[in-house]
């Protein structure tokens, strides 16, 4: 599927598309009623003005932050139909503003950290509903068991279970709306919470003061997922389905508020000592067992969306040189559905660690929100440059960006209050991920700066002579090198050293393959240049940042196409094999760098490069990353010299 057809497919508005959107996009933001009002009220006595203030703050947060910023503005910043912070960075990279790499890396790391905390919070909040019937039950083993099953089935793909996501989430949102309406009809005064005055007043009357915004923010943590998963569903489908989702969410929040106002003067524990969660309290007693099951399934779906999103994020990070190469599997034929084993088990370990550390959802909520608000701020910064790129007037850009920086920094300051209570956990995770991405990107940049590029023109004559020099044993019929040289008439000096000096490698045909990762997510193009007639070819692959680099398969397709067009003869040049039309052998030569002992580095370069090579040992080898058959690959080691030593003065004695 081409990039344009992929974009056209997802830009279409359809009932099926809307249903799929419900199943994929809204799991995170859709399950927030499980814990938001519970967090705002906490252990304090229920006061009508606090309840109205909380509902009002939720209403305006969902309106300004989720609806206006993400659904209306940010979704317009699509990269050929794809969304997410890395897709946005790939889009604004063309502004040539180098420091934009910083918000991209911080935002991506924060989003990954959120993928570790969200599944435990959602699943734990849902499972704790069983305490209504079994007050002394330890929910930790149940939560861990659900998470283990969820992460284990990832390797088989989610095509089958994904069919149930849409109808299940439809039931979930319908349940939210109906439960809310039942309570609102009994206390319509709660509707006055649409007045923003109550939200403003909340900051002065809530026991936690300004920091209550940290709990209010939990209602919009899933907004970033709307943007990240745009490529799966399309902008129009998200915008239309959001109308239904927002109404269902608000009805439930207002319904919880109506119930709480009726119980003013009490605490949540005094209303129900076993399960003081207003989400479950609004349910009729006979419906609660069904509500617990539906909530748990919705929480699992929310977790699934974040796991899939994390795989996509890491895949993009690898293409943009932010992350070490790791093994990627394609469990189904669905486009864009990938499985990364190492990330899957790391996420599971992180989720289990969170559950064991905090044990209860109320304690996990303290760790929740800090990372994602950082991601939102980074998105706002990148969005500013997208608007500049689109030549939008500064009279529009300035007030919009200022508004969202004020809102998001307010949420950030409020969330910082959670730091000693658990917020440090996600911040440590996000910092570790930022460190890895920064090291990998910087090391790649240093490596590129110290790679010597030479003109192929200088070597044309000797290459042509080498291929027919019978005094040198033939190394391969076809000799293939990967190159990072962007220009067709250039090549790395180490490649020519490998062919001519290390051990002269005679071949009938030489091939240079260059991969260019494009800003378009699903581009698959190639260009063939004949540098020396019947001796040297260069193939340039232009691949989207979401496309897998299956070089072995793609190279075969290119060769097949060239043979069909009579552009190249790949039969063996050995007489006995040639007359029987036997295809010649192909040999790939890959270079593996190591840090030379002759390198003189500054301390920061030493830290970066040593850490880079440490991570590289644990990452995928070049042959695996390119999808090459190891039997046809030769790996050569080349020393990487940074700041070559000055000439050493030696005195010869007799």
From Swiss-Prot:
GO molecular function, one term: symporter activity
Keyword Flavoprotein: no
The reaction(s) this protein catalyses: K(+)(in) + H(+)(in) = K(+)(out) + H(+)(out)
Subcellular location: Cell inner membrane
Keywords on record: Cell inner membrane, Cell membrane, Ion transport, Membrane, Potassium, Potassium transport, Symport, Transmembrane, Transmembrane helix, Transport
CC terms in the record's Gene Ontology section: plasma membrane
Membrane topology per record: Multi-pass membrane protein
Top-level taxon of origin: Bacteria
Tagged with keyword Membrane: yes
Chain segments annotated as transmembrane: 17-37, 40-60, 71-91, 99-119, 137-157, 164-184, 202-222, 240-260, 281-301, 338-358, 369-389, 394-414, 423-443
Function text: Transport of potassium into the cell. Likely operates as a K(+):H(+) symporter.
Family statement drawn from the similarity comment of this UniProt entry: Belongs to the HAK/KUP transporter (TC 2.A.72) family.
Name of this protein: Probable potassium transport system protein Kup
Taxonomy of the source species: Bacteria, Pseudomonadati, Bacteroidota, Flavobacteriia, Flavobacteriales
